[in-house]
Amino acid sequence: MHPEAKEPDCGFSEVLPRELGSLFSDTYTEESHYAFCGTELRITQHYGANLGVAAPVWDAALFLCGYFEEQKLDFKGKKVIELGAGTGIVGILVSLLGGHVTLTDLPHALSQIQKNVSANVSSNNPPQVCALSWGLDQEKFPQDYDFVLGADIVYLHDTYPLLIQTLQYLCGPQTSIFLSSKMRQEHGTMHFFQDILPQYFASELVKRNKDEEINIYKVTRYQN
């Protein structure tokens, strides 16, 4: 445990090297509009910017946003971190709902996230945008989050131990984790949720889109 860890200083200029800006030259961008919880989100996706899976708005992210709307979850004043934020749509929505949000991803995705934050969130309560590599630098972050969020971040088997390690560090007894995932058999996603995750956390399937094969799990620490 590292109780001394505080919210990292994630000034955008500090976590994103200048040279990464060149990744976004001559790229194809697409702006999409989404409506959740009475607010409209304008999300730009930078295709062809070497972003890979971080570029698009995935269906699992939209499904999670819809779940928050349906359940009327109260994020006001809550401390929230999103892992593998990609476009940032989930964390941006939570920020607009009053959460104190930190959006994280690998360094190459941060410019896209920051642009979407700037397009949607006023200066009153902007999310922090930070680099976080699972299993490597999670100890730069605090351990008192109310919510940890992830949308379509369970798809590479080699990263599963790193994700578990990161969740174990970030989550305290009071933390609720929401993971929304496309259940891709070829990527072992079901294996993660049925066999790996229960070794470390209690999990509950709270929402399922049968047609799209997307599940939302609420995950918490086991209570002694």
From Swiss-Prot:
GO terms for cellular component: centrosome; cytoplasm. The keyword Methyltransferase applies. It is an enzyme of class 2 (transferase). GO terms for biological process: peptidyl-lysine methylation. Its EC number is 2.1.1.-. It holds the Pfam family Methyltransf_16. Keywords: Cytoplasm, Cytoskeleton, Methyltransferase, S-adenosyl-L-methionine, Transferase. One of its GO terms (molecular function) is protein-lysine N-methyltransferase activity. S-adenosyl-L-methionine binds at W58, G84, A85, G86, D105, W134, A151. It comes from the Eukaryota. It catalyses: L-lysyl-[protein] + 3 S-adenosyl-L-methionine = N(6),N(6),N(6)-trimethyl-L-lysyl-[protein] + 3 S-adenosyl-L-homocysteine + 3 H(+); L-lysyl-[protein] + S-adenosyl-L-methionine = N(6)-methyl-L-lysyl-[protein] + S-adenosyl-L-homocysteine + H(+); N(6)-methyl-L-lysyl-[protein] + S-adenosyl-L-methionine = N(6),N(6)-dimethyl-L-lysyl-[protein] + S-adenosyl-L-homocysteine + H(+); N(6),N(6)-dimethyl-L-lysyl-[protein] + S-adenosyl-L-methionine = N(6),N(6),N(6)-trimethyl-L-lysyl-[protein] + S-adenosyl-L-homocysteine + H(+). It is found in: Cytoplasm; Cytoplasm, Cytoskeleton, Microtubule organizing center, Centrosome. Belongs to the methyltransferase superfamily. METTL21 family. Protein-lysine methyltransferase that selectively mono-, di- and trimethylates 'Lys-165' of the translation elongation factors EEF1A1 and EEF1A2 in an aminoacyl-tRNA and GTP-dependent manner. EEF1A1 methylation by EEF1AKMT3 is dynamic as well as inducible by stress conditions, such as ER-stress, and plays a regulatory role on mRNA translation. This is EEF1A lysine methyltransferase 3. It comes from Xenopus tropicalis (Western clawed frog).
